[in-house]
Structures are given as structure tokens and as C-alpha cells.
Amino acid sequence: MADEDITLNEDQLLESLEETNGEQETEIATEVEEEGSMQIDPELEAIKARVKEMEEEAEKIKQMQSEVDKQMAGGSTTGLATVPLSLEEKQEIDTRSVYVGNVDYGASAEELEAHFHGCGTINRVTILCNKADGHPKGFAYIEFGSKEFVETALAMNETLFRGRQIKVMSKRTNRPGLSTTNRFARGSFRGRGARVSRACCHSTFRGARRAMGYRGRANYYAPY
């Protein structure tokens, strides 16, 4: 009888263990299914995708607005810079300007300004370049603050500049290549210092440096 009781107890324990393991496996499977359903919830994924799409659209709109703002700012600036001068204004500028020929190709606008600054206040120096390759053409224009300074500048004709004898003439109407209907190269920069722009094909100095005095006409000019 004792052996039978022990056998029954063992069978009962085994059945109990099997039932317990079965319940645990069922619970684990249920948890895994729930986790899987949460990970691949189509509604949640759709919401996430929509939020991402909205963020991308907002970023595109922001970039487009930034581009529009830049274009508007650039357009207003360009508009101010390209306001055409009247014929009278161009002629008045020409009366205060000289043509300088045989300029060394390596010369800068600042060097020309230094060479002529003893003649009077200089508003602008422009070295013309070829539009195709950006190389200097070998001549320049100098605009003074007053037409009275032009006579002094003409006395600089045939002086040496960077080892070359330059040619200085008044900028006149009807002179080939020196028409008053043509302004200085576009894109000139106002302010002190030289500015070089290959795109606009010119090197320009703009400023107002006080005259230091001209030491007479000779083959050498000492500006200081």
C-alpha cells in the first residue's frame, strides 16, 4: 500500500508540474504576441510616418521661404546698384575723369591710386579686363572728386608707372573706347580699398584720399 501511495503521489506531482509548465508557456506566448502586436501596430506606424512627412514638408517650406527672402534682398540691392545715370550725370563724371593707357598688366587699382593721389581727391580707379578670360586690357579710368584735379593729372602723362611710360588723357565724348555713354565697369564697390571681380572683369578702388602734392612733371613721380 505504501508503494502505491508513493506512486500516486509521484503521478500527481508530475501532472501538477505539467499543468504549471503549460500555463507558464501559455502566458509567455501571450506576452510575446502582445509585444509583437505593439511593435507592428499599423496605426502607430502610420502616425509616425505622417509626423515624419509633416516635419519634412515644414523643412521644405522653411527652405523655400529662405530662398525667397534671399532673392528679394538680392533684387532690391541689385536694383539700387543698377539705377541708370542720366546723360548729364555721365558727362559730369567724365569731366572729372582721365584715361590712363599702357598700364602694366600686373598693376592693381590701389597702386594706380597711390601714383595719382597727389593730384587730388580720387573717387574711383577702374582697371578694365577682358570679359572672356579676365585678363587686364592695359588701361584704366580714374575719377577725381573735382574736375580741377584733372589738369594736374594730365601732367602725369608719360611718367613711369611700374617701369612703363603711361599715357594720360582726358576722358572725352566721341573718343573711341571712351564714350560718355559708357559707365565704368559694372559692380563697382563703394568704400576704401581695392576690389577685384573677375566676373565683372574689373579691378576697382573707391575712396577719398587727400592729395599730398605733386612734385612737378618728370619721368619719375614720388607720391610721398
Swiss-Prot record:
Which keywords label this protein? Coiled coil, Cytoplasm, mRNA processing, Nucleus, RNA-binding
Tell me where in this chain the RRM domain is found. 96-173
- A biological process (GO) annotation for this entry? nuclear-transcribed mRNA poly(A) tail shortening
Acidic residues compositional bias, start-end: 1-36
Q: Specify the domain of life of the species encoding this protein.
A: Eukaryota
A cellular-component GO term for this protein: cytosol
Record flagged with keyword Coiled coil: yes
GO MF entries: poly(A) binding; RNA binding
Q: From the UniProt record, list the coiled-coil ranges.
A: 9-74
Q: What is its main location?
A: nucleus
Where in or outside the cell it occurs: the entry states: Nucleus; Cytoplasm
Region named Disordered: 1-40
Tissue-specific expression:
Expressed ubiquitously in all transcriptionally active cells.
Knockout-associated phenotype: RNAi-mediated knockdown results in reduced alpha-1,3-fucosylation of chp. RNAi-mediated knockdown results in overproliferation of testicular cystocytes undergoing transit amplification leading to increased incidence of spermatogonial tumors.
Q: How are the domains described in the entry?
A: The RRM domain is essential for specific adenine bases recognition in the poly(A) tail but not sufficient for poly(A) binding.
Q: What does this protein do?
A: Involved in the 3'-end formation of mRNA precursors (pre-mRNA) by the addition of a poly(A) tail of 200-250 nt to the upstream cleavage product. Stimulates poly(A) polymerase (PAPOLA) conferring processivity on the poly(A) tail elongation reaction and also controls the poly(A) tail length. Increases the affinity of poly(A) polymerase for RNA. Binds to poly(A) and to poly(G) with high affinity. May protect the poly(A) tail from degradation.
Kindly state the subunit structure of this protein.
Interacts with ZC3H3.
Question: What is this protein called in UniProt?
Answer: Polyadenylate-binding protein 2
Q: Which organism encodes this protein?
A: Drosophila melanogaster (Fruit fly)
